Amino acid sequence: MTTALWGGKVGQRSNKSEYLPSMPIGCWLLSRIRAERRMNKYLCVIWLSVLGIVSVCGDNHTDTDSLSALFNVDEVQVTARALSKDIIIPQTLRGVELQRLNSLSVADALRYFSGVQLKDYGGVGGIKTINVRSMGSQHTAVYYNGIQIGNAQNGQVDLGRFSLDNMEQIALYNGQKSDIWQPAREFGSAGNVYLTTRKPYFRECEKVHVRAQMRAGSFALANPAVGVDVRLAEGVSMTLDAEYVYSNGKYPFRYKRVLPDGQVAYDTTAVRQNGDINAVRAEAGLHHYYSNTGFWRFHLYNYYSERGVPGAIVNNVWRNGERLWDRNTFAQVQWQDEFFGRWSVRALLKYANDYTHYINYDERLLPADNQYLQQEIYLSVAQKVMLFRWWDMSLAYDFQYNHLHREDLILESREEFFHRYSHWLSLASAWNVQDYLRLQASVLMTQVDKEAPRVTPGVFLSLRPWQRIDLSINAFYKQSYRYPTFNDLYYTDMGNANLRPELARQHSVELAYRLQKKRVQNLLLSVSYYYNRVSDKIIAYPKGQQFRWTMLNLGVVKINGLDTKADMSLSLPMRFVLRLRLNYTYQTAIDVTNPSDTYYRHQIPYIPWHSGSAVAGLDYGSKRGDHYGLNYSFIYVGERYGQQENTVFNYVQPWYTHDLSLYGEWNIVQRHTLKLTLEVNNLFGQDYEVIQNYPMPKQNFRCTIAYRY
């Protein structure tokens, strides 16, 4: 159950009617069908008629964002669907949890999720992408306020460009969301990351909110940001956000290499060069909630950056000749409503325009001066009908057009155009037998250009044996399909026109337990085992330059993994609150394509066997409303290999970091607050590399002062 902006109830159902009588399941189902048959006849006719129109027209688009986390304005509180109601329990960071982390961007925060591997090239401006459960970055879709962020060029999203300053929640789902009312395209990803920006909410007497902050730190970091929320009318509001980021990226590091016989080959201390960044982000949003179930939302986003691309350090040779300019702009509209209390419709529309300019000045490498212009149009519509109180069905259709213009400014005659038409059609059903058994099934048809359509199914189950004990057994099986990107197929010195599509099969079983008591505000324990099999897996790894990659089909990869998570909030005497968050992952991801290969059954590149994180926070709230907190975080990534062959030459050492932060927040005047945060990252100054030959910063500091009204 969720709460609308004005306190109305969205999607409320009677709990009494959900309990099974003491009769056989078959008799119970028959009685429920007879009781509601008349009521549902006209709904089914209307729904199927509209679905037929949708299938013919095809000009549709779906929204991933829902009313599952809205605001009660009068009480100024956030309500969200209980975790125990989800078949797939997401990993989430929201609100105060995000502020507590020593994180500058979304990529930094995602490191604290289990089963996630982050590719980070160092510094504020280094490109950052994620890999979930070793499936590959292209199998992980990123959604911004409910609509996927596309990149037909390379299929990867640089998460370093998304700030945490205006972020309300980050959620990671393995498989897919538990709600079948979603865009068809969402059923086709192995994992989904949902980024939700702050929505404005006001007390009855409030009309304007203002946020302003300044962050400064090591490596000449300067990061001012400002935000304004305006209440235009009842249920109508506008948001404006802007941010600037600068850093020279010059941080000290130690480069050391030891030969297999133990002799030191290189041991150098130097300062990282060409890691500077100048970036500007501006966003505007318009929100209109016109009923308890209906709203529309418009969002405009623009990001521009100029950065150096710090090169790899190989055999004590520095490469610092690469520069990168990015501009990412998109406008998106979302609308959804509910009719007759049972039929729900959601539609989305998006236009994106992305520009990239890449230059390589390094004389030791081939010169490069390339421009890329991408355009994307995305349409979707999704419908859901409640056939019975225990049975929902949904149908969704998505269409996307991508166009890429590539121009080589060195070779004037080298100009290329690529385009792609993609269609997704999904049918899903959800059954809820009391709160004991939840079952979902979906089937997705994907067609890209003139390729033959590919059908991928998914089945999800959640069993809760005891009503009074919040213990659930969750499992799913899913297939997902990924077509090679433009870079995979055509990019010079990297592309491979003979690449075959990937097909992934996921199996997962999870045991989850949740407890809420007076002192234990929230306790969540979960253990997940998963087995994934990827056919014709496409692997990308650096080839001396982080902007260029080498692409190849590995054939078959088998992935086995175990994720464990623990999350707890504990109320202590004297107004203290202790928060703990622990994650651990063990996984093997091996190439089993050809027994004659030298890397047969070797761990694939950059997948550690062991990884984990820990976050602890102690908060204190005074009687006058001031807040103070001390936060500690720890991240560990075990040994791994940087190439296909697991040899001593390709070995990448494990690394770990300790981060510490201290904050104070004061009410200086009524509704005016001032917050000061001090951070120390990599507390003990460890030398480490996330990507081989790309050294990371040692100990560094940040200070943030923020004002809110």
Regions found by a protein language model. Name each.
Residues 70-101:
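N-terminal periplasmic "start-of-domain" segments of outer-membrane beta-barrel proteins
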Residues 107-148:
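Extracytoplasmic beta-strand/coil segments of soluble accessory domains associated
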Residues 164-211:
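A beta-strand signature from Gram-negative outer-membrane beta-barrel systems
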Residues 197, 214-220, 244-248, 290, ...:
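Transmembrane beta-strands of outer-membrane beta-barrel pores
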Residues 249-251, 269-282, 287-345, 351-376:
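Flexible loop and strand-edge segments within Gram-negative outer membrane beta-barrel domains
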Residues 276, 287-289, 471-476, 507-509, ...:
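Conserved C-terminal beta-signal and adjacent last beta-strands/turns
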Residues 321-338, 465-534, 542-573, 604-610:
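Outer-membrane beta-barrel signature, preferentially recognizing the C-terminal barrel domain
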Residues 433-436, 525, 529-533, 553-641:
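Gram-negative outer-membrane beta-barrel transporters
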